[in-house]
Amino acid sequence: TNAIDAIMAFGPRLDNLLGCHNFYPQQYTGLGDDRFLAYSQKFRRHGVRTAAFVTAPSADHGPWPVSEGLPTLESDRHRSIASQVHHLRLTEVIDDVLIGNALANEADLKAAALAFFCPYPALRVITDQAPSALEAKIAFSEAHLYRGDASDYLIRDTQPRVRYAGQPLPVHDASGHLQRGDVVVVNETYARYAGELQIVLRELPNDGRRNKIGHLTDEDLTLLPLLKPWRTFMLKQVSH
């Protein structure tokens, strides 16, 4: 990683350079997330395009006679390929994504392409029961902007409460406690805030004013710390 400083000392043309992480066939040998970010910043600091590898669950061929995946990040080894791509996008240090193993099937190639080329990173939400039509529209049909004056308890997108002001959002699934990763829409009993989309960061009591409509998948719950204030993201509805 120190070689990049020596290379840059010669004033190379940046459009002839690409920084690329390694892939790691052996389980438990991939980069940790913090080290990955630190190494990537060396390239970013010089304005060098940077690439990393994901692994295709459908593929089993690599450079060595082992089939334990070929990711750059150890935390990506057992993720779905779409979640791996969104993970790399959320780090904001990677320009290009490569599939390390062969031969990925059509489904994995399509999932990786959709994740890479979609306008914003997306997190998947499991809905135990169907949300109302308006709640589904709020949560899944539009991009969300993480409000900049951020709370320790909630990620807030306040724009839906403006767009859908005055529309009915009756109470349902609004009791007990909310857990990290729960996705809620503020209901009509909280008039000023009705329609606001929120993702729970810390456990808190539900006082009846927030309708729980789903929960982040286990895979994507681990990506929650990478969401930053003032960033735009999307939510995707999935079933169990």
Predicted regions and their residues:
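Catalytic alpha/beta core domains of metabolic enzymes, predominantly
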Residues: 2-129
